[in-house]
């Protein structure tokens, strides 16, 4: 399972504070995220600006990969709220196969590719502030363990019509 998180409102927030405060704030948030990744034995893939990417089930199999990223996401949401009430978090999650590997000649990077990665990214992009937006494959894995609200069918760029869900909490 792959998770993308975007600190919503960070761009407008950062236009009103000094660069030093921006770096400190982002470092505080990402440090908490790093600790949560360790707590859940997940894999931090990368950060890009105010975006954070996580996976579970790679490089080592984890039959609870979907639950792992969902529980992590719930704690990430609470963490951002506790650190800065002016910021929100949009999270997208999808589950399925990925290709993983190390690329590069100088700055090596472990990265992921594939449809699951693209769908998780789209779930974040089409999500809402303070919401965890999940794809149907993830929903099918965890539907008996969490509460959801139905997002209904949405048109997802590059994918067409998709049924998606907003995760509320653990049952």
Where are these regions (language model features)?
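Short, surface-exposed loop/helix-turn segments at secondary-structure junctions
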Residues: 103-114
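ATP phosphate-binding glycine-rich loop and adjacent ATP-lid/helix-beta elements
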Residues: 123
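A short glycine-enriched loop-to-beta-strand structural element that forms part of the catalytic core
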Residues: 55-57, 86-101
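Catalytic core regions of nucleotide second-messenger enzymes
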Residues: 40-41, 45-48, 78-92, 153-156
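Catalytic NTP-binding/metal-coordinating core of nucleotidyl cyclase/transferase enzymes
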Residues: 1-71
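Key residue(s) within conserved catalytic/signature motifs
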Residues: 118
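Cytosolic regulatory/linker segments at or just downstream of nucleotide-handling modules
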Residues: 98-100, 126-171
């Amino acid at each position: 399972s792959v998770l993308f998180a975007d600190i919503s409102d960070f761009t407008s927030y950062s236009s009103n504070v000094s660069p030093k405060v921006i770096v400190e704030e982002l470092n505080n948030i990402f440090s908490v995220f790093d600790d949560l990744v360790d707590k859940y034995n997940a894999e931090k893939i990368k950060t890009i600006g105010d975006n954070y990417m996580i996976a579970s089930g790679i490089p080592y199999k984890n039959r609870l990969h979907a639950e792992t990223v969902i529980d992590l996401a719930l704690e990430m949401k609470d963490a951002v709220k506790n650190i800065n009430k002016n910021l929100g978090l949009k999270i997208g999650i999808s589950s399925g196969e990925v290709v993983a590997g190390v690329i590069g000649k100088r700055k090596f990077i472990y990265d992921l590719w594939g449809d699951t990665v693209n769908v998780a990214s789209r779930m974040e992009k089409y999500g809402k502030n303070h919401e965890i937006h999940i794809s149907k494959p993830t929903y099918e894995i965890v539907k008996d363990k969490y509460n959801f609200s139905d997002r209904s069918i949405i048109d997802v760029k590059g994918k067409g019509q998709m049924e998606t869900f907003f995760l509320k909490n653990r049952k």
